[in-house]
Amino acid sequence: MDKKSLYKYLLLRSTGDMHRAKSPTIMTRVTNNVYLGNYKNAMDAPSSEVKFKYVLNLTMDKYTLPNSNINIIHIPLVDDTTTDISKYFDDVTAFLSKCDQRNEPVLVHCVAGVNRSGAMILAYLMSKNKESSPMLYFLYVYHSMRDLRGAFVENPSFKRQIIEKYVIDKN
């Protein structure tokens, strides 16, 4: 087995078939200004203690937040095994990086706060990695977020796309 195939096998194997984690209900602070949440967290964003400048909506449904100055960015994504989310990684990670640099809080969410939003958060954290071992960093971030939130990027296709871009292509 070649190195790339081995890495992909080990990463997918170590993050699959784990105990069934329950869906997270609370918003998680990922970096100083980037938060991960679900649809309910987004609806509650205007009254949150965090003064969000942006909400990144990754659900299929477009909405507004009445009486709010929060800017909503909508990227409609389907949570299935055929959706190519990797084509959004560069734009989303660049946007989240700017939010962090400018101290502009942003909430990234999908319906449950698990797959679509989790994948974008994982991609963002992987894009910031300057370590020499992207495979170990992937496992560290994945398991740390899973410990914090419960379910996190359970969609095997989304995991595979992140692994291919940020782990396999880096080796």
UniProtKB/Swiss-Prot annotation:
Pfam families: DSPc. It catalyses: O-phospho-L-tyrosyl-[protein] + H2O = L-tyrosyl-[protein] + phosphate; O-phospho-L-seryl-[protein] + H2O = L-seryl-[protein] + phosphate. Keywords: Host cytoplasm, Host-virus interaction, Hydrolase, Inhibition of host innate immune response by virus, Inhibition of host interferon signaling pathway by virus, Inhibition of host STAT1 by virus, Interferon antiviral system evasion, Late protein, Protein phosphatase, Viral immunoevasion, Virion. Its EC number is 3.1.3.-, 3.1.3.48. One of its GO terms (cellular component) is virion component. Coiled coil: none annotated. One of its GO terms (biological process) is negative regulation of MAPK cascade. PROSITE patterns: TYR_PHOSPHATASE_1, TYR_PHOSPHATASE_2, TYR_PHOSPHATASE_DUAL. It is found in: Virion; Host cytoplasm. The keyword Secreted does not apply. GO terms for molecular function: phosphoprotein phosphatase activity. InterPro entries: Dual-sp_phosphatase_cat-dom (IPR000340), Prot-tyrosine_phosphatase-like (IPR029021), Tyr_Pase_AS (IPR016130), Tyr_Pase_cat (IPR003595), Tyr_Pase_dom (IPR000387), TYR_PHOSPHATASE_DUAL_dom (IPR020422). Its main location: virion. Serine/tyrosine phosphatase which down-regulates cellular antiviral response by dephosphorylating activated host STAT1 and blocking interferon (IFN)-stimulated innate immune responses. Dephosphorylates the OPG144 protein. PANTHER family: DUAL SPECIFICITY PROTEIN PHOSPHATASE, DUAL SPECIFICITY PROTEIN PHOSPHATASE MPK3. Belongs to the protein-tyrosine phosphatase family. Non-receptor class dual specificity subfamily. Homodimer. This is Dual specificity protein phosphatase OPG106. It comes from Monkeypox virus. The gene is OPG106.
